Every structure is written in structure tokens, then in C-alpha cells.
Amino acid sequence: MVTIKIECRTIARGVAEGEVLLSEDALSFLGNVDPKTGVVVDPGHAIYGECIRDKILVFPHGKGSTVGSYVIYQLKKNNVSPAAMINIDSEPIVAVGAIISDIPLVDRLDKDPFTIFKNGDRVKVDSTSGFVELMDR
């Protein structure tokens, strides 16, 4: 059993564990995700049909409307939000959404998350301490 610890930059503080859901596509929470169910509803999106509830959602960055921050908040209020989010490079829409929703958010990992993580991996995000752990693989 090996645990890999990766340093990162903290955007929104917190600690969460969960299963990785990778999306190589940028994500617009307004329009791509149903705020009532947490399901990705855009048929052109890489993770179309997937539910982000309780996942460690890994995606390059957000895109789209500033309303996306409030969609993230609505996901949290509806108990269908991701447990944590990991970005290559966070932008203000996702950052604000994570902060107001108390969802841990990190970016700028020391290692490329798309080469180190696989869908279904167990990951701990400790954005308070500035690291992500890939649990026993």
C-alpha cells in the first residue's frame, strides 16, 4: 500500500475524502450541471451523465457565467455538491463558489492530476494544510 502526498495551492480551506471524478473539459456550473441532482447534463461534456455528488472533482478550470458561483452554492444546499475540487488553475467563478459553499478547492499541484489520478481513486484533499493525498493504490 502506497500513499502519495502532493503539495498544492489552497483556494478554499477544508478537508474532504472521496472518489476521484476526472474531467479533461473545463466546467461551467451554469448549464453543464443540474443544481438539483448534481448530474452533468451537457451532452457535449466529457463527464456527461455523471453525478458529482461527494466526488473529488478534478477539472482544468471553470468557464462561463459568474452565476456559476451561485450554482455551486445551490449544489451544496441541495446536498449534491462535490466533496472537494481540484483544478489545474482555478479562476474566480469556481473559487468564489467553493468559498461561499465551504467546499475545499486547490490548484497548482506539484504533479499533473490528470497523469497521477484515475477515476475511482480514493483521495484526501487537505486544503487547510496545502496537500492532496492519493490513498493506498
Curated annotation (Swiss-Prot):
E.C. code: 4.2.1.182
Pathway connected to this protein: Isoprenoid biosynthesis; isopentenyl diphosphate biosynthesis via mevalonate pathway
Cited InterPro entries: PMDh-S-like, PMDh-S-like_dom, PMDh_S
Active site per UniProt: 65
Pfam families to which the protein is assigned, alphabetical: AcnX_swivel_put
Keyword terms, alphabetized: Isoprene biosynthesis, Lyase
Domain of life from the UniProt record: Archaea
Reaction catalysis annotation: (R)-5-phosphomevalonate = (2E)-3-methyl-5-phosphooxypent-2-enoate + H2O
GO BP, one annotated term: isopentenyl diphosphate biosynthetic process, mevalonate pathway
Membrane-spanning ranges: none
GO terms for MF: hydro-lyase activity
Function noted in UniProt: Component of a hydro-lyase that catalyzes the dehydration of mevalonate 5-phosphate (MVA5P) to form trans-anhydromevalonate 5-phosphate (tAHMP). Involved in the archaeal mevalonate (MVA) pathway, which provides fundamental precursors for isoprenoid biosynthesis, such as isopentenyl diphosphate (IPP) and dimethylallyl diphosphate (DMAPP).
Family designation: Belongs to the AcnX type II small subunit family.
Subunit comment: Heterodimer composed of a large subunit (PMDh-L) and a small subunit (PMDh-S).
Protein name: Phosphomevalonate dehydratase small subunit
Organism annotation: Methanococcoides burtonii (strain DSM 6242 / NBRC 107633 / OCM 468 / ACE-M)
